Amino acid sequence: MVAAKTIKSLVDKADLPDNIKEELYNKLIEYNKKYKFKKAEVEAIIEETVKEYQNSLVEPGEAIGTVAAQSIGEPSTQMTLNTFHYAGVAEINVTLGLPRIIEIVDARKNPSTPIMTVYLDEKHRYDREKALEVARRIEGTTLENLAREMSIDILNFEFIVEIDPERLEKSGLDMEKIQKKLESSFKSAEFEVDGYTLIMRPKKVTKLSDLRRLSEKVKKHRLKGLSGVGKTIIRKEGDEYVIYTEGSNFKQILKVPGVDPTRTRTNNIHEIAEVLGIEAARNAIIEEIVNTMRDQGLEVDVRHIMLVADMMTLDGVILPIGRHGIVGEKASVLARAAFEITTQHLFEAAERGETDPLNGVVENVLIGQPVPVGTGIVKLAMNLPLRPKRE
């Protein structure tokens, strides 16, 4: 049996990335206990691993962009084009399939169905009542959400709201709190509470249109919860309770007492970049695309997706793949013109006196030169031997 120290020194000498070295070392230690390897066997395993690793590297000149585009694009043709309910939660809609992939690669500022998955800390995650406490802190509640009926009394110039007692109790608010919050936010009106009825009277408004406008603002006013977050759903996953939110406010959710900030996540990639940085956003892009494809029963090698995520986050900000992002920033005039809005690109380039270095694939195809891909990247010059002198 080989000593762990010897295995460590042999693995360290191998020409492999650190993460593979670590995994290889752990596996060798595990199997060494079981099979009691000789030193020569350990060396043979390491040698075979290095050989396999080198065989798996991309060949110089491989058109990895084209391969990635094919590998992601082909399975995408089999994806759904609809927005579906979240798995097991009928109340929350989430964009799946091709629309979600397009949303990610277009780097849209606001996803069409923003969602946060909120994990709870040790104290709150195993008890539904405690999870409900946290959900109440998060859930955005407006007067409209609590109302059973709303009406405008034209004769008395009043806005009357009948509150649903059940919804009120569920929200953790009471009539007095609602009155105080509205009074502090709307100085131009008086608020009166009568049982479960709230009456608003404007102080100065004389037109019916002004009363309608004010009543719209009052009913949409946020009474509690995080801005940007609508309803919340609590689901049991394994032993713990997890909260799903409709809407996203990643910066604020991490500060809410009872939330586990190390595991909580959002599907808004721009929020992740802003709060956790560009590396976290890159990981989120990879994970979102992989999960979206996996939900449709499609498997794509993660390295193709990693390449897309790397290109999108290379400059430290999230760039879309398109004329407003990566393609629009290409150094080649002809490549930009070949993609979209051809004449505009050519006119602007002529105006600035730009030159094209002809380093890429598209521009060389356009002018009929060999493409710098595969054998096209190799430049050979033959050194002919001198003819021997005649005797």
UniProtKB/Swiss-Prot annotation:
GO cellular component: cytoplasm; DNA-directed RNA polymerase complex
An annotated GO BP: DNA-templated transcription
Catalytic activity, EC: 2.7.7.6
Subcellular compartments: Cytoplasm
Domain of life: Archaea
Pfam family, one: RNA_pol_Rpb1_5
Gene3D superfamilies cross-referenced by the UniProt entry: 1.10.150.390
Keyword DNA-binding on entry: yes
InterPro entries assigned: DNA-dir_RpoC_beta_prime (IPR045867), RNA_pol_Rpb1_5 (IPR007081), RPO1C (IPR012757)
Subunit structure comment from the entry: Part of the RNA polymerase complex.
Family: Belongs to the RNA polymerase beta' chain family.
PANTHER family assigned: DNA-DIRECTED RNA POLYMERASE, DNA-DIRECTED RNA POLYMERASE III SUBUNIT RPC1
Protein name: DNA-directed RNA polymerase subunit Rpo1C
Lineage of origin: Archaea, Methanobacteriati, Methanobacteriota, Thermococci, Thermococcales
Gene: rpo1C
